[in-house]
Design a protein with these regions (language model features):
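Ligand-binding clamshell of periplasmic/extracellular solute-binding protein-like
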Residues: 1, 13-20, 116-124, 141-150, ...
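Extracytoplasmic "Venus flytrap"/periplasmic binding protein-like
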Residues: 1-12, 22-24, 109, 128-137
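Structural signal for hydrophobic
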Residues: 10, 32, 56, 160-163
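General beta-strand structural signal in soluble alpha/beta enzymes
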Residues: 10-13, 72, 87, 141, ...
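Extracellular/periplasmic Venus flytrap/periplasmic-binding protein
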Residues: 17-19, 27-134, 169-173
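Short clusters of hydrophobic/aromatic residues that line enzyme substrate/ligand-binding pockets
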Residues: 20-21, 160
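Extracellular/periplasmic periplasmic-binding protein-like sensory domains
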Residues: 26, 130-174
Length: 174
């Protein structure tokens, strides 16, 4: 909009807020990755096939993407399952260093599973707190396959982390 005679395509490799291809769509925006709704549709297909999950805890970063993940989780869990959402919490993005209080809430809620869109340091710190708290249930996530995150979970992450994503499918080490 600043230079209408010098158009540039915006090649978006990671922002998956559905608004970018819906109500805030722009002809010059191109996204490689599936949006948060499409990814949650896939995640909840998997969750619907796990009869032991009766209660789910949603936790995410407090910005448009985190809110989109929570809204999609609520929508698709309600459509496909009878799973009760026992927590739906947003935290300040990049500001929480110790997720122990959140991990304690997750444990106290009796959640059988966790859904998060967290990425980066927030996912590493959430994973660390979940592991240290003794949480053993599945974590369904969008961005939990980078080496720092898988290293944080270590061996405990095998069978615990469930990812929907694009690109490289396996991190270089557990």
């Amino acid at each position: 909009k600043r230079n209408p005679d010098k158009r540039v395509i915006f090649i978006n490799y990671s922002a998956v807020d559905p608004a970018l291809t819906n109500d805030k769509c722009n002809f010059w925006h191109f996204r490689f990755d599936a949006n948060a709704d499409i990814k949650m549709d896939a995640i909840t297909d998997v969750i619907a096939g796990v009869p032991s999950i009766k209660k789910m805890y949603l936790i995410g970063q407090d910005y448009s993407f985190g809110k989109a993940v929570a809204a999609a989780a609520e929508k698709y869990l309600a459509q496909k399952t009878s799973i009760e959402i026992v927590g739906n919490e947003l935290h300040p993005i990049g500001k929480v260093k110790d997720f122990t209080p959140y991990a304690r809430k997750i444990l106290a809620s009796g959640a059988d599973g966790v859904i998060t869109g967290n990425w980066g340091a927030d996912m590493v710190n959430l994973g660390k707190s979940l592991s240290e708290s003794g949480y053993k249930g599945p974590v369904y996530c969008y961005y939990c396959a980078s080496n720092g995150i898988t290293a944080t979970f270590g061996e405990a992450g095998k069978g615990m982390l469930h990812l929907v994503g694009e690109g490289l499918q396996n991190p270089s080490r557990p």
